[in-house]
Swiss-Prot record:
Keywords carried by this UniProt record: Ribonucleoprotein, Ribosomal protein, RNA-binding, rRNA-binding
Protein name per its UniProtKB record: Large ribosomal subunit protein bL25
Membrane-crossing segments per the record: none
Cellular component terms per the entry's GO annotation: cytosolic large ribosomal subunit
Annotated source species: Wolbachia sp. subsp. Drosophila simulans (strain wRi)
Record gene name: rplY
Function in brief: This is one of the proteins that binds to the 5S RNA in the ribosome where it forms part of the central protuberance.
Length: 203
């Protein structure tokens, strides 16, 4: 499991906060944002819509450590919320959270299901029933994995994989307690075609 690369985003300090001014900001090709966090004052930001949208559409912002270049000052952050236009689906506002590189953070990491070809249950026609596609973990910012792999090797129809079965990279641990050993994926039998009995007709 490889660690994620840090994504860099440029931003400027923003003084305006009124709705009309924010609308004007968007018309000029910018996106309003904010960064907040424990022990920090809230800071209003302006982002380039073109630059941010490119990163957003590439999927590089999900569960990634962000290096924010705020008017020349670097801050580390996570994207916590992206508000989209209800009709146009364009980015309207972005929330960031300050990250202290020396402390652990909570973050959702996508699960990657590997070795389907080595699962007898799937070879026999079983269906992979995914119940959980991401999981909350704790780690230091420099240990954030790109994905957490779930190994399907050897799994038969009717078998499941639970969260405690998943191996985590060094320095990464689950947020959930050990007693919450919930199921993340099962291999189920495919629905078989059943012929309906023909109704008898009287002559």
């Amino acid at each position: 499991m490889t660690q994620q690369e840090i994504v860099t985003i440029n931003a400027e300090l923003r003084d305006i906060t009124k709705t009309k001014a924010m609308h004007s900001l968007r018309k000029k090709g910018n996106i309003p944002g904010i960064i907040y966090g424990k022990g920090h004052d809230n800071v209003n930001l302006t982002l380039s819509a073109k630059e941010f949208t490119k990163q957003y559409k590439s999927g590089s912002l999900s569960a990634h450590l962000i290096e924010l270049n705020i008017s020349g000052k670097k801050e580390y952050a996570l994207v916590r919320d992206i508000q989209l236009h209800v009709v146009k689906d364009t980015v309207q506002h972005v929330d960031f959270q300050f990250v202290d590189k020396g402390s652990e953070i909570k973050i959702d990491i996508p699960l990657s299901f590997v070795n389907e070809s080595k699962a007898p249950g799937i070879k026999l026609g079983g269906v992979l029933n995914v119940l959980c596609r991401s999981i909350a973990v704790k780690c230091s910012p420099d240990k954030i994995p790109q994905v957490i792999e779930v190994d399907l090797s050897g799994k038969m129809i009717g078998q499941s994989i639970h969260i405690n079965d998943v191996k985590l990279p060094e320095g990464v641990k689950f947020v959930a307690h050990e007693e919450e050993n919930f199921t993340i994926v099962t291999i189920s039998a495919a629905d078989s075609d059943v012929e309906e009995p023909q109704a008898e007709t009287e002559e």
